[in-house]
């Protein structure tokens, strides 16, 4: 469950290490984002020679949450922390590699590229 001011680690190779959510997209009253939701983020910690710089604003998709996601069969998939993948304006991933597992809930038309790049899909 991600809300405004939440800090997330970055699960790709764009050079960003940590981002902060500044807006949950999808309606003016929408407060929380879960796995598969698009949020607006700002880069808080970046690698020295990365593709992105500190202070820049991007779209991102949430790929892991500590809150987890409930499946239809009743199982619950949780992670140790919150993570996101940075996206460009067309909602395509900026990075070329994804680190760590992602969930099957991302297997939609919009985020198939992220699922195919991920080393493990839970």
Swiss-Prot record:
Task: Please give the GO cellular component terms listed in this UniProt entry.
Answer: cytosolic large ribosomal subunit
Gene3D superfamilies according to UniProt: Ribosomal protein L14
CDD domains attached to this UniProt entry: Ribosomal_uL14 (cd00337)
Gene Ontology BP terms: translation
- An example Gene Ontology molecular-function term: large ribosomal subunit rRNA binding
Per UniProt, the keywords (alphabetical) are:
Ribonucleoprotein, Ribosomal protein, RNA-binding, rRNA-binding
Presence of the UniProt keyword Transmembrane helix in the record = no
Q: Its biological function?
A: Binds to 23S rRNA. Forms part of two intersubunit bridges in the 70S ribosome.
Q: How does it assemble?
A: Part of the 50S ribosomal subunit. Forms a cluster with proteins L3 and L19. In the 70S ribosome, L14 and L19 interact and together make contacts with the 16S rRNA in bridges B5 and B8.
Q: Which family does it belong to?
A: Belongs to the universal ribosomal protein uL14 family.
Q: Which PANTHER family match?
A: 50S/60S RIBOSOMAL PROTEIN L14/L23, LARGE RIBOSOMAL SUBUNIT PROTEIN UL14M
Q: Which HAMAP family match?
A: Ribosomal_uL14
Q: What name does UniProt use for this protein?
A: Large ribosomal subunit protein uL14
Native organism is: Janthinobacterium sp. (strain Marseille)
Per the record, the gene is rplN
